[in-house]
């Protein structure tokens, strides 16, 4: 880096430039260095980062919403109630949170509700873009939740369905007959959370080996490594057809 150049005052006489914080010929003082982080994100000892960035928050209870829900949510609820006579029995609660609509469905009714949401002309939720699982350990006896993201491409709307089951009876009707896109996603929810989708054409594990014990994304799944030992492995020589030297 070049040394600072002399500048001239208004009269054209060179005036030496002295760096801020320097005296005479001494170099300028540098700001004190910040303390070095140790471990993960500055945590020391345990390596636990759960408190970093405000990721730990008190669990809040999400209550059922009351009308009017706002936006197109009332139109969706009204159309579903009109098209589906068992609406009052099948819908456990309606939640509006963070600008999103979630219908909590009785487990045995989930496929019926999806059928109506897809086929009714006033609803037309043609696409199930996602089926995922959630484990709310300690929050409820029915701690395993299946979550369905539905999209109406006709009306450009999105809603969410949620159905909860217990670990002792983790059964839900499969929605693959209504939304074929749910096939592999239901398999993943079964593999990771142990939710059993009755009527699925081939409900097998999709990520873990078939003989794997347990469901890795349940909150009570034991953490720890699996010891694996490799013997007799041979590494082929590198491909020398290309030279990068």
Swiss-Prot record:
One Pfam family, short name: Complex1_30kDa
Gene Ontology MF annotations: NADH dehydrogenase (ubiquinone) activity; NADH:ubiquinone reductase (non-electrogenic) activity; quinone binding
Chain segments carrying region Disordered: 1-54, 217-245
Membrane topology value: Peripheral membrane protein
GO cellular component, one term: plasma membrane
Keyword Cell inner membrane attached: no
Location in the cell: Cell membrane
Keyword presence, Translocase: yes
Keywords per UniProt: Cell membrane, Membrane, NAD, Quinone, Translocase, Transport
InterPro entries: NADH_DH_suC, NADH_quin_OxRdtase_su_C/D-like, NADH_UbQ_OxRdtase_30kDa_su
Listed Gly residues bias regions: 39-54
Biased composition range(s): Low complexity: 11-28
Composition bias type Basic and acidic residues, residue spans: 1-10
Top EC class of this enzyme: translocase
Enzyme Commission (EC) number: 7.1.1.-
Chief location: membrane
PANTHER family assigned to the protein according to its UniProt record, in alphabetical order: NADH DEHYDROGENASE [UBIQUINONE] IRON-SULFUR PROTEIN 3, MITOCHONDRIAL, NADH DEHYDROGENASE UBIQUINONE IRON-SULFUR PROTEIN 3
Record's subunit section: NDH-1 is composed of 14 different subunits. Subunits NuoB, C, D, E, F, and G constitute the peripheral sector of the complex.
Function comment: NDH-1 shuttles electrons from NADH, via FMN and iron-sulfur (Fe-S) centers, to quinones in the respiratory chain. The immediate electron acceptor for the enzyme in this species is believed to be a menaquinone. Couples the redox reaction to proton translocation (for every two electrons transferred, four hydrogen ions are translocated across the cytoplasmic membrane), and thus conserves the redox energy in a proton gradient.
Family under the similarity heading: Belongs to the complex I 30 kDa subunit family.
Record protein name field: NADH-quinone oxidoreductase subunit C
Native species: Salinispora arenicola (strain CNS-205)
Gene name of this polypeptide: nuoC
